[in-house]
Amino acid sequence: MAASGEPQRQWQEEVAAVVVVGSCMTDLVSLTSRLPKTGETIHGHKFFIGFGGKGANQCVQAARLGAMTSMVCKVGKDSFGNDYIENLKQNDISTEFTYQTKDAATGTASIIVNNEGQNIIVIVAGANLLLNTEDLRAAANVISRAKVMVCQLEITPATSLEALTMARRSGVKTLFNPAPAIADLDPQFYTLSDVFCCNESEAEILTGLTVGSAADAGEAALVLLKRGCQVVIITLGAEGCVVLSQTEPEPKHIPTEKVKAVDTTGAGDSFVGALAFYLAYYPNLSLEDMLNRSNFIAAVSVQAAGTQSSYPYKKDLPLTLF
């Protein structure tokens, strides 16, 4: 059932409801018929430069759905960094706490995408790794007044941990995406996560279990739940996602409709950004309903090339989602 009317905005208009503490990457994308083997040079048929980075991707998707957003991040004092700040502004994202540094280049992601929409990616985090706790403290006011705070692991883990700690202290709902995953993740990441959302390969790294099906994902999610998260979501690409929580520890599979994927790059970030939007603006929806809607939005994103360029706007989506 569609939520009635516009979201209730009881807070002041200029306050960001969704704050993302995370990464900005310039995507350097090559489209090829297939992925190259080790030591092989192959011809691609198209190259383009786009905007990516898990943090900014998630923020852009939330903003395009209508969320008031703020991005806490660090880019280089270079042309990629300048262009990135302009991109955030074009998406109506507050850049008050988008820092620039001379000490490192803006982060980059070299991405190769085949005809099936599968990809391989190498990231060089650059300036992202210089975002520090001092920068977070300068942004404390915007973090403490948010409805939802989102972070990932493309910035220094200690910085993400500090962001989660600050949000939790202020009673702000935390949405943590442990990507890229690290096997020996600090246990505090689990206990500080109201919603812990990862994909199947990240779940494998974090738990040591094989995740090849929804049933496997349910078992891995249980392991993660026992580490102290309130809610665990494991996304399964075209198979949707699996969810469980402290209050409903029985794994539930939320399937998604089948679509023809053109480019799956950034689909997980579209999902997280959509989920952040629903958590902030429609907190009374059931979790299952939020996940169905987030699945739908992520499925729209894989039907176009590029990362943020494939993310839908509210005006392009069915009214039943809002």
Curated annotation (Swiss-Prot):
Catalyses which reaction(s): D-ribose + ATP = D-ribose 5-phosphate + ADP + H(+)
Protein name: Ribokinase
Protein species of origin: Homo sapiens
Leading EC class: transferase
Source taxonomy: Eukaryota, Metazoa, Chordata, Craniata, Vertebrata
Recorded GO CC terms: cytosol; nucleus
Family stated for the protein in its record: Belongs to the carbohydrate kinase PfkB family. Ribokinase subfamily.
Source species, domain of life: Eukaryota
Protein residues bound to substrate: M25, T26, D27, G53, K54, G55, A56, N57, E154, D269
One Pfam short name: PfkB
Active site annotation, chain numbering: D269
Subunit structure, interactors included: Homodimer.
Main location: cytoplasm
Function, as annotated: Catalyzes the phosphorylation of ribose at O-5 in a reaction requiring ATP and magnesium. The resulting D-ribose-5-phosphate can then be used either for sythesis of nucleotides, histidine, and tryptophan, or as a component of the pentose phosphate pathway.
Intracellular or extracellular location(s): Cytoplasm; Nucleus
Example GO biological process: pentose-phosphate shunt
Cofactor info, note text: Requires a divalent cation, most likely magnesium in vivo, as an electrophilic catalyst to aid phosphoryl group transfer. It is the chelate of the metal and the nucleotide that is the actual substrate.
Keywords: ATP-binding, Carbohydrate metabolism, Cytoplasm, Kinase, Magnesium, Metal-binding, Nucleotide-binding, Nucleus, Potassium, Transferase
Recorded metabolic or biological pathway in which this protein acts: Carbohydrate metabolism; D-ribose degradation; D-ribose 5-phosphate from beta-D-ribopyranose: step 2/2
Xref: Gene3D superfamilies: 3.40.1190.20
Activity control note: Activated by a monovalent cation that binds near, but not in, the active site. The most likely occupant of the site in vivo is potassium. Ion binding induces a conformational change that may alter substrate affinity. Competitively inhibited by phosphonoacetic acid, etidronate, 2-carboxethylphosphonic acid, N-(phosphonomethyl)glycine, N-(phosphonomethyl)iminodiacetic acid and clodronate.
EC number: 2.7.1.15
PROSITE patterns documented for this protein: PFKB_KINASES_2
Co-factor requirement: Mg(2+)
Gene Ontology molecular functions: ATP binding; identical protein binding; metal ion binding; ribokinase activity
Residues annotated for K(+) binding in this entry: D263, T265, S301, A304, G306, S310
